[in-house]
UniProtKB/Swiss-Prot annotation:
Its main location: membrane. This is Putative transport protein YidE. The keyword Repeat applies. The chain crosses the membrane at residues 4-24, 28-48, 65-85, 95-115, 158-178, 371-391, 393-413, 437-457, 464-484, 493-513, 533-553.
């Protein structure tokens, strides 16, 4: 058997063993995809004992390409919501998550200085303690750039594996500890979260208002400032028994019922100006109007603003709301359409069908993957990661590398959505498949390279010490920030758990947090809010630590 065939066969065996290990769960918690690392260590140990030689060049390529696939698909997935998460609504969560990252780096620096831990080892412990695989890849790359021997670079994977198990357990123990210390009632916390959402600014809601302000009688909708803004959409108007789709030029009269869509605060402001909120139904049932959701799949409308498509003027159809990447938005006239946007339309059946034809509404296209944008994005990401950033006093130039470059490029492209006929939307199933494939390949190679010396290091070397260092790096930031967030910021417990899981970019911890309450989405929401920024920082941090430690000698 050739070296290439043997290498592929061994990698397949690693994946099988590792995924089987990952599926083993204790009280609903397992290693998940991280099991592949331990599968690689097990197989690598026996491969080393048998004296089998694998293709080093091929293993290196597979490791790097797997990492690129993983971080690129993450960026494409979270890109549409990344920049929004940095705004005020998620600022507090992101600040606490960033504090966890910074504290982890500081604890790592202190341990390195006090105990003189070798640089590759301490970076591996850091990456494993925070359960972040791309950090491992970024750290290994910067070490190679610094001229570190290959055998020492491989030590990073070994120390990563030592610290990884408690990295997962440490998050779960912190969640349990917070619940114990503050005597948390999970059901009550879930109800508080739902109440805060209902009273907050994040949900798009509707309100039916009767026109009672005499100053608005016989005025056109476009002449009423509150109705001629991008914050409120008037999607239906009922006069006597007639329901209609209003246009900007529609004249409103006293007694008209308006169906408005917007955020709660804006709806309240509109109600103060227009009149009184009523419980009267403005349903399209039994009328010649209907409400339908259509999806944007036509390349010709991608990037065009809603106002430029003139749906109201041409088809007498109103877009009442827009759903992008699972987030409900007011359909602002300045909003540009992206592939996969879901539009809520109100109008007559024939008119809605006409608009659906314009925007595409081809459901099968949502399951298709444009491969050209994928490789354009990966290529641009690799180029971005290769650009050197020279910092005075540093021995080597900083680079985003193969972990950071594709991630940043994917975030940007995911936010842009489309350029001409190229769109960076990827079906969730395809994104997940590529992401899982990438991380399996990466972890399999890391495990194989670490497996030969793993047992000896654990039983006869410094393996137990490495585990101890990892416990400090995991526990100190999580417990400290958890206490601060709960005591001073009065953070909801479920939101706190999601933030802690997101700060470690740890899906098993998110699964545990989600299981705390069957119906609440609080943990998943906070996890998604902090995940993009934290992932970026986790990739950059080991590079900064490596350069700083290297410069300190």
């Amino acid at each position: 058997m050739s070296d290439i065939a043997l290498t592929v066969s061994v990698l397949a065996l690693v994946a099988v063993v590792g995924l089987w290990i990952g599926n083993i769960k204790v009280r609903g918690v397992g290693f998940g995809i991280g099991g592949v690392l331990f599968g690689g260590i097990i197989v690598g140990h026996f491969v080393d004992q048998a004296g089998v030689t694998l293709s080093g060049d091929m293993l290196h390529f597979i490791q790097e390409f797997g990492l690129i696939l993983f971080v690129y698909t993450i960026g494409i997935q979270v890109g549409p919501g990344f920049f929004a998460s940095l705004r005020v609504s998620g600022l507090r969560l992101n600040l606490f998550a960033v504090l966890i990252v910074i504290m982890g780096g500081l604890v790592t620096a202190i341990l390195h200085k006090i105990f003189a831990i070798p640089l590759p080892v301490v970076l591996g412990i850091f990456s494993g303690a925070v359960t972040n695989t791309p950090a491992l890849g970024a750290g290994q790359q910067i070490l190679r750039d610094l001229g570190t021997p290959v055998d020492l670079v491989d030590q990073m994977g070994m120390s990563y594996a030592m610290a990884y198990p408690f990295g997962i357990c440490g998050i779960l123990l912190t969640m349990w500890l917070m619940r114990l210390i503050f005597r948390v009632n999970v059901e009550a916390e879930a109800q508080k979260h739902e109440s805060s959402l209902a009273n907050g600014h994040s949900l798009i809601q509707t309100m039916n208002i009767r026109v009672e302000n005499p100053n608005l009688n016989n005025m056109a909708i476009q002449d009423v400032p509150i109705l001629n803004s991008d914050k409120i959409i008037c999607s239906r108007l009922k006069r006597d028994d007639t329901l209609m789709v209003p246009s900007p030029g529609t004249i409103i009269q006293a007694g008209d019922l308006l169906h408005l869509v917007g955020q709660p605060t804006d709806l309240h402001n509109a109600q103060l100006v227009i009149g009184k909120e009523v419980d009267t139904s403005l349903s399209t049932r039994g009328t010649d109007l209907r409400v339908e959701r259509v999806v944007v799949t036509n390349e010709k409308v991608l990037g065009k603003r809603i106002r430029d498509l003139h749906f109201k003027e041409r088809y007498d159809v109103v877009i009442s709301r827009l759903n992008r990447a699972g987030v409900e938005l007011v359909a602002s006239s300045d909003a540009s359409l992206q592939f996969g946007d879901i539009l809520n339309l109100v109008g007559r059946p024939a008119s809605i069908d006409a608009v659906a034809n314009v925007v595409g509404n081809a459901q099968q296209k949502l399951q298709q993957v444009q491969m050209l944008p994928v490789f354009i994005g990966i290529g641009l990401g690799v180029l971005l990661g290769s650009i050197p950033l020279f910092v005075p006093g540093f021995p080597v130039a900083l680079k985003l590398g193969l972990a950071g470059g594709p991630l940043i490029m994917a975030l940007i492209l995911g936010r842009i959505g489309s350029i001409g006929k190229l769109y960076w939307f990827m079906p969730p199933s395809a994104n997940l498949a590529l992401r899982e494939l990438g991380i399996v390949l990466f972890l399999a190679v890391v495990g194989l390279k670490s497996g030969g010396d793993f047992v000896d290091t654990l039983t006869q070397g410094e393996g137990l010490s490495w585990i101890g260092y990892g416990i400090f790096i995991t526990a100190i930031p999580l417990i400290t920030v958890g206490l601060l967030a709960r005591i001073f910021a009065k953070m909801n417990y479920l939101t706190l758990c999601g933030m802690l899981a997101g700060s470690m970019t740890d899906p098993p911890a998110l699964a545990f947090a989600n299981n705390l309450h069957a119906t609440s989405g609080a943990a998943a929401l906070s996890y998604a809010t902090v995940y993009p920024l934290v992932m970026f920082l986790r990739i950059i941090t080991p590079q900064l630590l490596a350069v700083i430690f290297w410069g300190m000698g």
